[in-house]
UniProtKB/Swiss-Prot annotation:
NCBIfam families listed in its UniProt record: glmM, PRK10887.1
Keyword line: Isomerase, Magnesium, Metal-binding, Phosphoprotein
Keyword Isomerase: yes
Gene3D superfamilies: Alpha-D-Glucose-1,6-Bisphosphate, subunit A, domain 3, Alpha-D-phosphohexomutase, C-terminal domain
GO biological process entries: carbohydrate metabolic process; peptidoglycan biosynthetic process; UDP-N-acetylglucosamine biosynthetic process
Protein name, entry field: Phosphoglucosamine mutase
Catalytic activity as recorded in UniProt: alpha-D-glucosamine 1-phosphate = D-glucosamine 6-phosphate
Active site, per annotation: 100 (phosphoserine intermediate)
Gene (UniProt): glmM
Cofactor, how bound (note): Binds 1 Mg(2+) ion per subunit.
HAMAP family named in the record: GlmM_B (MF_01554_B)
Length: 449
């Protein structure tokens, strides 16, 4: 059995790879490992709007109850809401059934510990080991020792909306906002929060039918929202993904504003308020060099991690940083939540736009995105580190870096899933970096022939 857990829980095509049987086993093992030896434990269960959610929830909950834990089912709710409410309700764990931005045929199961954080690799391995060993030493419970399922009646959604609203001071009156809910988990929470704060709210893709989640909508397909914002003269647009743990924005001219710009704007604002701990934001190696240049001007440090919001969070926790995130719109505000939170991000951004008295596009001028070129070099899995060993490749990388002279960079990343090495170049001249990236990729490919 290979490793079951990926970077974001267990994922696969529902009913084929992620079966009801596997969901039952994950519920049983997760509940046993995460609550071992405590009182009758409580586990919060939420999901996005996928048609397979009901099937997987039934199986997952059966597993949870079989080891004597209580399952509190809150229905359709954003992933970050489960992270927050697990803490608020003093639950022993939280589980989300969602495949985030993936197409509808996929689903996933992701656990949070009692503090609202994603599980460590060690805990995930313990859950997998229990399943692999066929639940050896797990007692079979009967009678009154079996757990109960509690259906929650909307209080969780209300509590999450109130929490999200509390993260900004004042209101959003006078702001005209377009929201794209991706027919996903934010179709109630985001709309209500913005309305209750006084914004004029226009919404698209907020009629989930179980199969339209992420379909030509949300943060992975923002084209309709870009058009809508301009057509309806909105001050800004905000696009969520299926489970609303990320958010991308649209300025009033219809331009897509990615996570790098959001980090720059929010980082500057936090510094102004004296809340940017250690004057630092945490980003990944894939963030645009333009962000580093912009932050340098603002006298803000950037610290880089591997790609993945779990690595960003690790770095933030280690050094108590206030904000970090990815280009994809996964932004973590550690003062507010323990994971990327699309609604909290959207509210921070909207509040900054309102309070600044500037247009959103003016605020975005804080940063100039450098042209970026990404070229794949085909490399056998056992030779993916050739760029670290081969003298000619190393010399070519050094030469390119020297010629870019601080206004560009070379980044090489082996793919974790395919026999590829990704060659990424940034610089001021698109034509030049395009030529250099293709040349370097070709050199790498020739060396492994």
């Amino acid at each position: 059995m290979g490793r079951m857990f990926g970077t974001d829980g267990v994922r696969g095509i529902a009913n084929k790879e992620l079966t009801a049987d596997l969901a039952y086993k994950l519920g049983k093992a997760g509940a046993f490992i995460l609550t071992e030896g405590t009182h009758r434990s409580k586990i919060l269960v939420g999901m996005d709007t996928r048609i397979s959610g009901d099937m997987l929830e039934s199986a997952l909950v059966a597993g949870i109850l079989s080891v004597g834990a209580e399952a509190i089912c809150v229905g359709v709710i954003p992933t970050p809401a489960i992270a927050y409410l697990t803490r608020k309700y003093n639950a022993d764990a939280g589980v989300v059934i969602s495949a985030s931005h993936n197409p509808v045929e996929y689903n996933g199961i992701k656990f949070f510990n009692k503090n609202g954080y994603k599980l460590s690799d060690e805990l995930e391995d313990s859950i997998q080991a229990l399943i692999r060993d066929d639940f050896k030493d797990v007692p079979v419970l009967t009678g009154e020792n079996i757990g109960r399922k509690i259906e929650e009646d909307g209080e969780a959604i209300r509590d999450y909306i109130d929490f999200a609203k509390s993260t900004i001071k004042g209101d959003l009156k006078g702001l005209k906002v377009a929201l794209d809910c991706a027919n996903g988990a934010s179709y109630i929470t985001s709309v209500e929060a913005f309305k209750e704060l006084g914004a004029e709210v226009h919404v698209i893709n907020n009629k989930p039918d179980g199969i339209n989640i992420n379909r030509n909508s949300g943060s992975t397909h923002p084209e309709d929202l870009m058009e809508y914002v301009v057509k309806n003269n909105c001050h800004m647009g905000l696009a969520f993904d299926g489970d609303a743990d990320r958010c991308l924005a649209i300025d009033e001219k219809g331009n897509l504003i990615n996570g790098d710009f959001i980090l720059a704007i929010c980082g500057k604002e936090l510094k102004k308020q004296g809340r940017l701990k250690k004057n630092t934001i945490v980003v990944t190696v894939m963030s645009n060099l333009g962000l580093d240049i912009a932050m340098k001007k603002e006298e803000i440090n950037t610290i880089k991690t591997k790609v993945g919001d779990r690595y960003v969070l690790e770095e933030m926790l280690k050094n108590d940083y206030a904000i970090g995130g990815e280009q994809s719109g996964h932004i973590i505000f550690s003062d507010y939540n323990t994971t990327g939170d699309g609604l909290v991000t959207a509210l921070q951004l909207a509040h900054i736009v309102k309070e600044s008295g500037k247009t959103f596009s003016e605020l975005c001028s804080i940063m100039k995105e450098l042209p970026q070129v990404l070229v794949n070099a085909k490399v056998p899995n056992d030779q993916k580190d050739i760029y670290l060993k081969d003298e000619e490749i190393k010399s070519e990388i050094d030469t390119i870096t020297k010629n870019l002279d601080g206004s560009g960079r070379v980044l090489i990343r082996p793919s974790g899933t395919e026999p590829l090495v990704r060659v990424m170049l940034e610089g001021e001249n698109q034509k030049e970096i395009d030529k250099l990236a293709h040349g370097l990729a070709k050199l790498i490919e020739n060396k492994v022939k």
